[in-house]
Amino acid sequence: MLKTAAAALMIVLMSVGTAVSQTQDDGPIATASPRSESADSVRLREALAYSNPLPRGAPTQDYPLVAWCDALVTGHADLGDTLTNRNPEDTELVRLGRLEAQDFRSALVAAEPRQSAAVKAEAQRAAAAAKAQWAPLLANTDETSRSQAFGLFFGLPGRCEHAARRIRENITTPPATPAEVGLQDAPAAE
């Protein structure tokens, strides 16, 4: 009995391994959300993104946050453009960064008429602060240092993409909490 179960398990594991191997050989793995993503899936990802803390210096309001995210990803792409010895992966990161920045800018343009002067000023300050972080690296004449810095950029908070969608679509209700999407027990009513 155990030998039969072990043999069956091996067959399953081998077939899963083959399927994974074939899938990985088929090309890049898509990490962006598909166009057909369900509303529940978006709500779940949004709840997770908003439940995680933002990095130090990141604005908490959506509009300034999107401006900050745009400046960070644009700075990273600008740094990548300074490299003369880019490999194909670096070139792809620059391309994807430019697309992400374009998405952030289109969200900012769509939402700009609805923002107060104070929020717009906060967004400008946030973008300037993020851009200033890249300035010393962009000015560095040592390509090895620039290349290392380019490789160390860990990406943006997940909240950036959701904040961009929320300001573009004029969503003013608070994002769902993890408890509201079933990830945590809801707090007890007092």
Task: Provide a role label for each language-model segment.
Residues 1-4:
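Positively charged n-region of N-terminal signal peptides that target proteins for export
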Residues 17-21:
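Sec/Tat signal peptide C-region and signal peptidase I cleavage site
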Residues 24-48:
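Acidic, low-complexity proline/glycine-rich segments
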Residues 47-55:
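Short linear interaction motifs
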Residues 55-114:
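Short N-proximal segments of mature Sec-exported proteins
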Residues 100-190:
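Compact alpha-helical subdomains of small soluble proteins
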